[in-house]
Amino acid sequence: MRWILHGVLFVALAAGVFSLLPRLGGLTRDASGLRHARPAFIVAAVVAQAASLGCYAQLYRRILAALGAKVRFRLAADVVLASFFVSHLTPFGSATGTLVNVSTLEADGIEASTTGEGIALTSLMSTVALIVLFGTGFVATAGRHLSRTYLTIAGVALFLVVAVLAVVFAVGAHPAIAGRAARRLARVARRFRPGIDPEQAAQTGSRLASLARSALSGRAFLASFGFASGDLLFDLLSLDLMFLALHYQPGFGPLAVAYAAANIASAIPVTPGGLGVVEVTLVAITVGFGAPRATAVLAVLGYRIVNYWLPLLPGAVAYLRVRLRSAKAGPSRPSAG
C-alpha cells in the first residue's frame, strides 16, 4: 500500500513539474521552436549522460578498491543504476538505495560496513568536486555585468562552501576531531531520535576520518577526484548540449553556478531525486544570467528527461539483475560457512 501511495505521489509530482514549468515559461506560443532543435546535440547529451554515470560507477569502484574490496565495473555499474532507480522513485529513497547497494555487495562477499564506508566516501568526493565546480563557475562569472544582489548572495554562498570544504579537510585530517564532532551532532540528534548512541557515532566518525586519510590520499585522491569531476562535468555537458540544441549558449560560468546550486538544493530530501527543485533552480538562475525564459525551460526539461527519466530504464533492468543475483547467492551462504 505504501509503494502505491508513493507511486501516485511521484506521478502527480512529475506531472505537475512538467506541465507547470512550461506554463510559467510562456511556452504555449514558443514551443514551436522545438521544430528547429538540433537532434545531434540531443543525442550527444544522452551520450554525455552515459559517460557521467560511467564515471560515477568508476568512482565508487575506486573507493571500494581503496578500502580493500575489489568489484568488477559491471557490478559497480549495476549497483549504481539500481540504487539510482530505487532512490529516484521513492521519497527519502537514498536509504532504500543504500539497502539495495549493501545487500547486493554482501552477496559478492563484501561486508555491509565496508559498503557503507564506501558510500560515505563516494558522497564525500562528489561533494568536494561539486564545491570546486561551484567555485570555478563563480570565478568564471566575475567579468560579467551582474546585479549587486547576485554578487552578495553568490559571495556569501562561496564563502560558506569554502568554509565547509575547509572543515571537511580539517576533520578528515584529524580523526579525533571527527569523533568529537560526530558525538556532538549525535547528542543533538538524540533529542529527536532517542535511539542514537553518541559514543557509537563518535567511533564511526573517527573511523571514517581515518579511512578518508588512508583511502583518499596521494594518487588515490587524485584518481577519485578525477572520476568525481568527470561525473559532474559530463552531466554539466549534457545540460549545455540541451541549450545548444535550442541554439543558445549560456556560457560555462553561469551554467556551472546554476548546476552546482541546483545539486546543492536537491540534497535536501524534499522530493525524490530533487524532482521539481532542480528544474526550478536551473531555470531561475540561467534566466537570471540572461537566457530566454522559454529556451531555459525547454532546455532544462529536456536535460531532466535525459538526466532523471532516461536512466530509470537501465536502472530497472539493473535492479532486477541485482535482485536475482542476491536471491541466487542467498541459499549458498550457509554452505559457504
Predicted regions and their residues:
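Hydrophobic alpha-helical transmembrane segments
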Residues: 4, 8, 42-46, 73-78, ...
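A short amphipathic helical element positioned immediately N-terminal to and/or at the very start
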Residues: 28-34, 105, 204-216
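Hydrophobic/aromatic residues in alpha-helical transmembrane segments
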Residues: 13-16, 26, 55-63, 101, ...
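Transmembrane helical segments that form the transport core of multi-pass membrane transport proteins
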Residues: 211-261
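Short helix-coil transition sites and intra-membrane helix breaks within transmembrane domains
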Residues: 51-58, 63-65, 88-99, 267-278
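Membrane-interfacial helix-loop connectors
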Residues: 67, 243-268, 272-302
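Membrane-embedded helical hairpins/re-entrant loop segments and their flanking transmembrane helices
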Residues: 55-82, 243-258
